Curated annotation (Swiss-Prot):
PANTHER family: L-CARNITINE COA-TRANSFERASE, SUCCINYL-COA--D-CITRAMALATE COA-TRANSFERASE. Its main location: cytoplasm. It is found in: Cytoplasm. It catalyses: crotonobetainyl-CoA + (R)-carnitine = crotonobetaine + (R)-carnitinyl-CoA; 4-(trimethylamino)butanoyl-CoA + (R)-carnitine = (R)-carnitinyl-CoA + 4-(trimethylamino)butanoate. This is L-carnitine CoA-transferase. It comes from Escherichia coli O1:K1 / APEC.
Length: 405
């Protein structure tokens, strides 16, 4: 198979990935593959472009390194072209409502007839099967969080709150990436394709288990946090200093002992409630939990962030300033690692945003292209799989494909 024109780089060079999906979850999986060197083809509707394009800046990040194919994959010759593309594809990712592809005649079995080794990742809110009440429902970030038990754990004591920005979308997209790579590893051993059913709510159910396991195995449900503080442990979470906010984790025998001396609670060490060797202070079970919070709040409020960071470094207490977005660019760690970078958009503008992550030492990722326009690579992709100029024009004339104007 000849690949589309692009530089060769990263650990996934030579891999062909195709995805069909809008907004964030499914495309995020595709983006990860593209930044790690895979050739990634982004399928868009012919009549309506991906709704993410209405955003002014985010798409330049989320759709960089992609090849844009505008094709009606469910109808007539458009469907034929899609299935021909699948013959040269390693991984196909689709994000839709339940078994939408199967309902429209593109089942796993149809895809495997064209490519027995194909890895297929289905990403939806509620999965490919289950009850009709849920399976075919649309789902976004907040829906998946609400249905999974994740949302109810977040927020404040007075009201639950979803985690933003769009946590369920990113977790689900990354799950699709890792699951597809796991499946591909097995396919290369067996020669038999795989189909993966990724339900966004199940992803969030798995991510939200730290506290829920206590309910499933004893009936105890953890309360929500208070003003950003850990719901279980004193000295953990968000705190206010004289000039801003920090997060800290008061964990460890010596850390607690030394911190208690600073905040005036050394006399509690070695008591039945806080015996020698205590590594965590339970804010509910320990009767002194509220007092620890009161004293710690007062001490932190009387010191600047710089003073707190210096003292906590001496005590080996983990803490960090809550950075504002403008502070990111000038932070020395960001600068040293080039965590924020710049690249050129297709129309020649400079775009700034997050760099490739993670950092591969021997086969690093690369930003080689900005977001392509709607249908920009349709002709090149169709030619790559054997279509002539006349074939492509016929698809366009029938409204089954769109090429760049």
């Amino acid at each position: 198979m000849d690949h589309l024109p692009m530089p060769k780089f990263g650990p996934l060079a030579g891999l062909r990935v195709v995805f069909s999906g809008i907004e964030i979850a499914g495309p995020f999986a595709g983006q990860m593959f593209a930044e790690w060197g895979a050739e990634v083809i982004w399928i868009e509707n012919v009549a309506w472009a991906d709704t993410i394009r209405v955003q002014p800046n985010y798409p330049q990040l989320s759709r960089r390194n992609l090849h844009a194919l505008s094709l009606n994959i469910f109808k007539d010759e458009g469907r034929e072209a899609f299935l021909k593309l699948m013959e040269t594809t390693d991984i196909f990712i689709e994000a839709s409502k339940g078994p939408a592809f199967a309902r429209r005649g593109i089942t796993d079995e149809v895809l495997w007839q064209h490519n027995p080794k194909l890895v297929i990742a289905h990403l939806s809110g509620f999965g490919q099967y289950g009850t009709e009440e849920y399976t075919n429902l649309p789902a976004y970030n907040t829906i998946a969080q609400a249905f999974s038990g994740y949302l109810i754990q977040n927020g404040d004591v007075d009201q639950p709150m979803p985690a933003f920005p769009y946590t369920a979308d990113y977790f689900s997209g990354l799950t699709a990436t890792t699951a597809a790579l796991a499946a591909l590893h097995k396919v290369r051993e067996t020669g038999k394709g795989e189909s993966i059913d990724i339900a966004m709510y199940e992803v969030m159910l798995r991510m939200g288990q730290y506290f829920m396991m206590d309910y499933f195995n004893g009936g105890e449900m953890c309360p929500r946090m208070t003003k950003g503080k850990d719901p279980y442990y004193a000295g953990c979470g968000l705190y206010k200093c004289a000039d801003g906010y920090i997060v800290m984790e008061l964990v460890g025998i010596t850390q607690i002992a030394e911190c208690f001396k600073d905040i005036g609670l050394a006399h509690l060490l070695g008591t039945p409630e806080i015996p020698e060797g205590t590594q965590l202070i339970h804010r509910i079970e320990c009767p002194y939990g509220p007092l620890v919070e009161e004293k710690l709040d007062a001490w932190l409020a009387a010191h600047t962030i710089a003073e707190v960071k210096e003292r906590f470094a001496e005590l080996n207490i983990a803490c960090a300033k809550v950075l504002t977005v403008p502070e990111l660019e000038s932070n020395p760690q960001y600068v040293a690692r080039e965590s924020i970078t710049q690249w050129q958009t297709m129309d020649g503008r400079t775009c700034k945003g997050p760099n490739i992550m993670p950092k591969f030492k021997n086969n690093p990722g690369q930003i080689w292209r900005g977001m392509p326009s709607h249908g920009m690579d349709t002709a090149a992709i169709l030619k790559n799989i054997g279509y002539s100029e006349n074939d492509i024009q016929e698809l366009v004339s029938k409204g089954l494909a769109k090429v760049e104007d």
